Each structure stands twice: as C-alpha cells, then as structure tokens.
Amino acid sequence: MQLVDTLKIKSYEKIKEFLNQEHVGRISSIDVNGFPQIIPMNFVFLNDSVYIHSHVKGEKLDNISKNNKVGFEADRELEFLPSYFEDPHNASLADTLYVSVVIKGIASLVSDRDEKTLALNGLMEKYQPEGYYDPLQSNMRVLNAVSVIKITPQTLHGKYKIGQHMNSKDRMN
C-alpha cells in the first residue's frame, strides 16, 4: 500500500467536520499573467460547497471571471517533530503531523439572494457561534455591498498524517 493511501481520510463526514472546525482556508485562482494567486479566507462549508465572502471588486473576482477553476485548501498543523528526537545528526527525519483538505472546484458568484443570505448567515454562525448579531434577511440592502463566491467541489480529498506512517516501534502507543 502506498503511503498516500495510508494518509487518506476516507470518511466524507470527517472531512466536513474538519472543514467546519477550521477558520482559515486558501483559495487559489489563476491571475492575468497565468500565475497562481493564493489568498487566505474565512469560509463556511454548506450544502457540500465552500462559500467565501469578498468585496464586490478585486483581483480574485477578476481571476474567477476569466477562469472559474480554482483550488481550495485548509489545514491544521498538529505537531512538528524535530529530527533530533530520532537522530541528532540527520535533519531529513524532521516531520510534521497534520490534517488537510484539498478541493479542486468550480467557482461562481452567488446571485440568488436566498443562497447569498444562507452563506453569509452560515459564516456568522461559524465565526460567532455565541450569537450577539442579527441574522441577515434576503431583502436587506447590505447584500448588495458584498460578493459571495461558491466553490463547487469537483474533487475533494482529505489527508491526515498523525503517525500512522511510522514504524510501530517508533510510535508512542
């Protein structure tokens, strides 16, 4: 079995749980010069899609209007393992334990006011779970002042490296 198979998160529910816990994800689009542009963003995962909010103008939106294929990534570093725990002279043994999700998807601007409201309220619920805000309504003018980008996954892969790649004698059980 390849190492990649060992690291794969096989449960879609676990991937969703991870995405709902993380606060920052990164959207990658292609700029006018053909280079990747990666931007950290707050996000919410709702109805099997990623939603992010944005200003109504900007490079990210320009990129998406020209090429709607995007990447999205969220990760959590669990622990850095310095090499000297294994061998005081071999730096190649340093490692990082982590969880990550990578999405390749299609980005679109949300124009439906009900969907936009759902996404923005979802963001508020995620980042301010204690409440103390008034939920948005689809007829509010404030919806005109913000863009909502929806990323519809074409592929979605989760990976976790938590020591399962180590020999059993090297793991602390």
Where are the regions that the model predicts?
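Hydrophobic/aromatic-rich structural module bridging two neighboring secondary-structure elements via a short loop
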Residues: 53-60, 65
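Extreme N-terminal tail/first-helix region
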Residues: 1-20
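Helix-adjacent hinge/juxtasegments
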Residues: 62-65, 69-84, 91-94
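A short local loop/turn or secondary-structure capping micro-motif enriched for an aromatic residue
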Residues: 46-47, 59-62, 80-81, 167-168
